[in-house]
Amino acid sequence: MAIVSSTTSIIPMSNQVNNNEKGIEDNDHRGGQESHVQNEDEADDHDHDMVMPGFRFHPTEEELIEFYLRRKVEGKRFNVELITFLDLYRYDPWELPAMAAIGEKEWYFYVPRDRKYRNGDRPNRVTTSGYWKATGADRMIRSETSRPIGLKKTLVFYSGKAPKGTRTSWIMNEYRLPHHETEKYQKAEISLCRVYKRPGVEDHPSVPRSLSTRHHNHNSSTSSRLALRQQQHHSSSSNHSDNNLNNNNNINNLEKLSTEYSGDGSTTTTTTNSNSDVTIALANQNIYRPMPYDTSNNTLIVSTRNHQDDDETAIVDDLQRLVNYQISDGGNINHQYFQIAQQFHHTQQQNANANALQLVAAATTATTLMPQTQAALAMNMIPAGTIPNNALWDMWNPIVPDGNRDHYTNIPFK
């Protein structure tokens, strides 16, 4: 009985142990499923990765030409597309990093060869903001066995328009197959380009393609500023033309001044410009005054000539002040003012010389009038009061003109 009871008691215990083990397995299975689902959720962030984390793309030049470029030209497929097919000459170099499939400091692209001219071999390397310029000749790339496998061309990006662009720090290496191999595959010519930036120089920040419209906005703002400058230049040109018109009017007035001047009398000139009215009245100048000839005739001639020179100098000084005023007021007076002033001064000198010759001729003529001179001396020797005034004027009538008689009424004869 005891044995049986012990046996029966052992059976339920063994069943309990089995059930416990089964429950532990179920919990482990359930926990495994939950952890697997959790791991799948965490792995969703990398489902679209083209390469594994930590992978770096640093191919050699031989690998770029023999594997990537040749397979692309031959039309073969790649398990992983690491190089983007892009016409990079349609974009500026600082826009390219956002379009590359991979790369941190250098970026790779398959580029179709676009010719600048339809019937020529020269490629078109002009972008939106500048152009790529080749430096040096092409270099042959050889394999480990020294077999030529391709060509390499180095280009530098210049911002602006050729040939006055500004050199930047963006550099590109263009790899292509030999020309005879391209014809062999009867494919469009394709090159493989590696773009990178020289370190230590900051030309333009690398921006995504969505922000590339800033360049167009900058061009529009630049165009508007250029149009504004042209408008201001046009207005300043019109103002300058108005000033030139005023200057021409002033020159005409000065010419009138020089033509209206006469030797006998006065000249009154009124010159008007855009700022103020300047009126200069030149006093009446008696260029020639006939004087009675006496023993001091030479002294009278010299004094008259000196007085005449002083008057002419005053006229020239007034004209020079007028010209100087016009120069200071106009700002850009033509040098013809000075030419007119010089002509006027030259004319005055000629008139002065002519008047001096007339005075000398008059003096020479007066020396021949000895009878009249003797009569004048004899009359001066007559005592005062013996000859009436009327008779005295009758004696002087041949010498003194009628027009200047009033000028000599105040001369005492005692």
From Swiss-Prot:
Keywords: DNA-binding, Flowering, Nucleus, Repressor, Stress response, Transcription, Transcription regulation. Residues 1-47, 200-251 are annotated as: Disordered. Induction: Circadian regulation with a peak of expression at dawn under continuous light conditions. Circadian regulation with a peak of expression around dusk and lowest expression around dawn under continuous light conditions (at protein level). This is NAC domain-containing protein 35. The keyword Disulfide bond does not apply. It comes from the Eukaryota. GO terms for biological process: flower development. It comes from Arabidopsis thaliana (Mouse-ear cress). PANTHER family: NAC DOMAIN-CONTAINING PROTEIN, PROTEIN CUP-SHAPED COTYLEDON 2-RELATED. Residues 233-251 have a biased composition (Low complexity). GO terms for cellular component: nucleus. Transcription factor that acts as a floral repressor. Controls flowering time by negatively regulating CONSTANS (CO) expression in a GIGANTEA (GI)-independent manner. Regulates the plant cold response by positive regulation of the cold response genes COR15A and KIN1. May coordinate cold response and flowering time.
